[in-house]
């Protein structure tokens, strides 16, 4: 039986808090389920909605001025959401509403509200790079990698982009400046800060509070546009979340990383924004080119990639004094693949203190073998490398999440060999190890190469798990 609680049965303060929040006397079940949420509920109840409405209006004026929404519509949407619980009787939905309202109440002002106040002066920190001098070299390197054969019948899984991306980009530029200790960017926008001729779409970010930020941003978009906004979590991408609108159009995504990972990511400071060091990004690009769909992207628009490649090459030339004279020494390092066990052995003794690297193509197998080694010194850099690294008895153990290209039966393609070398160099950069000679040889090994056809490729590791999502309109959280 769903009876109302007796006023003398429950502590008056807790009951009053819940009753005020729900706008009704709670049932016995509601009281017992919600009483542990009394502190959060009280914060929501006393929250100054007028100040919050003012902040959202200011965010709208600054970043979404072209969206046709009136101030009264914004206020009505906000007040409607903060009273939604009064018309909700499902306990699960009430918990979702409380959780999401709590995020807004406790974090919105510091995360997005702060963007409406006067910003600190921008510290101009740009260096003039001669990117043009690297364009021909970049084109030559990419041309030798342009070996994918496009299957025209294959449907590519690229996302549709929301018209709000330009508004969110404008907000993100300011967000990156205000929150540069917890949020950094990489990808085309970060290279645009070095070379204004770079074209970019959405802004790629790594941050330490991704979930909270995306919830706050989703609500800001909802209150301004009135659209239902959904946050999705993809199981095969570590700590990744994306905001989409009700038509499944992509607005922004983010990878979450720990603060200790953020601290070791190599980065540079440009106009009050931290970007991932372009050297690191160049290595990651070389690594990702072993992924067959990335090579297909290259074949579709080589000039887009050429501008990015030339920018990164000029950065490493200027920063590290790399000389592009074709001196490759022992690069790429020798790679032997065991296709049955899905392990690639890379000979590293010419460059590093560990004599070889065992690269596992199945993450669960690596985890099991690390346990058998009884070693506790592994490094997990989360989505920054998508891999754990361990050095034990002069052998590096690591996981590689991409496909391995073969140029012949049992022979690792040089594109993948360089990708594996780059993967090892990412570890060296993250741990402040030596990498510059190896980097120089790796880049020089990409010069004056002929195209080598792809014979076949290994499949990527299959990641288990289910998709998670937060549906604001339907009050559902599934993670």
Curated annotation (Swiss-Prot):
Binding positions (Ca(2+) 1): 202, 204
Protein name stated in the entry: Poly(A) polymerase catalytic subunit
Summary of the function given for this chain in its UniProt record: Polymerase that creates the 3'-poly(A) tail of mRNA's.
Protein's organism: Vaccinia virus (strain Tian Tan)
CDD domains registered for this protein in UniProt: polyA_pol_Pox
GO biological process, any: mRNA processing
Induction of expression: Expressed in the early phase of the viral replicative cycle.
Pfam families referenced in this protein's UniProt entry, alphabetically: Pox_polyA_pol, Pox_polyA_pol_C, Pox_polyA_pol_N
Binding site for Ca(2+) 2: 202, 204, 253
Family of the protein in this entry: Belongs to the poxviridae poly(A) polymerase catalytic subunit family.
Enzyme Commission number(s): 2.7.7.19
């Amino acid at each position: 039986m769903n009876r109302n609680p007796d006023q003398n049965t429950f502590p008056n303060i807790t009951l009053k808090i819940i009753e005020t929040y729900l706008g009704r006397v709670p049932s016995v079940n509601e009281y017992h389920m919600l009483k542990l949420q009394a502190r959060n509920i009280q914060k929501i109840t006393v929250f100054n909605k007028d100040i919050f409405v003012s902040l959202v209006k200011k965010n709208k004026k600054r970043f979404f001025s072209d969206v046709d929404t009136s101030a009264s519509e914004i206020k009505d949407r906000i007040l409607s959401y903060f009273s939604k619980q009064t018309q909700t009787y499902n306990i699960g939905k009430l918990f979702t509403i409380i959780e999401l309202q709590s995020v807004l109440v406790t974090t919105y002002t510091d995360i997005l509200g702060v963007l409406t106040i006067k910003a600190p002066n921008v510290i101009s920190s740009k260096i003039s790079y001669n990117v043009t001098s690297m364009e021909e070299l970049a084109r030559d390197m990419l041309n030798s990698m342009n070996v994918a054969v496009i299957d025209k019948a294959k449907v590519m899984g690229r996302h549709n982009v929301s018209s709000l991306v330009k508004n969110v980009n404008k907000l993100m530029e300011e967000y990156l400046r205000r929150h540069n200790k917890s949020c950094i960017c990489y990808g085309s926008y970060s290279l645009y800060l070095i070379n204004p001729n770079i074209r970019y779409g959405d802004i790629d970010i790594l941050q330490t509070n991704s979930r909270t930020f995306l919830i706050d941003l989703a609500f800001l978009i909802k209150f301004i546009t009135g659209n239902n906004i959904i946050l999705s979590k993809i199981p095969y991408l570590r700590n990744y979340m994306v905001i989409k609108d009700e038509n499944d159009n992509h607005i922004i995504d983010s990878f979450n990383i720990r603060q200790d990972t953020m601290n070791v990511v190599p980065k540079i400071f440009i106009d009050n924004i931290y970007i991932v060091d372009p050297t690191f990004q160049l290595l990651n690009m070389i690594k990702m080119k072993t992924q067959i769909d990335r090579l297909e992207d290259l074949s579709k628009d080589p000039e887009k990639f050429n501008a990015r490649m030339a920018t990164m090459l000029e950065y490493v030339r200027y920063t590290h004094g790399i000389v592009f004279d074709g001196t490759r020494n022992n690069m790429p390092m020798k790679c032997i693949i065991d296709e049955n066990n899905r392990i690639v052995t890379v000979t590293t003794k010419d460059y590093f203190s560990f004599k070889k690297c065992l690269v596992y193509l199945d993450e669960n197998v690596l985890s099991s073998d690390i346990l058998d080694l009884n070693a506790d010194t592994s490094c997990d850099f989360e989505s920054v490398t998508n891999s754990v690294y361990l050095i034990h008895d002069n052998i590096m153990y690591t996981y590689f999440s991409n496909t391995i290209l073969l140029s012949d039966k049992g022979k690792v393609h040089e594109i993948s060999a360089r990708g594996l070398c780059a993967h090892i160099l990412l570890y060296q950069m993250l741990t402040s190890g030596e990498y510059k000679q190896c980097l120089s040889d790796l880049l020089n090994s990409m010069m004056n190469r002929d195209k080598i056809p792809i014979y076949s490729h290994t499949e990527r590791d299959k990641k288990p798990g289910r998709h998670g999502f937060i549906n604001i309109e339907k009050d559902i959280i599934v993670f």
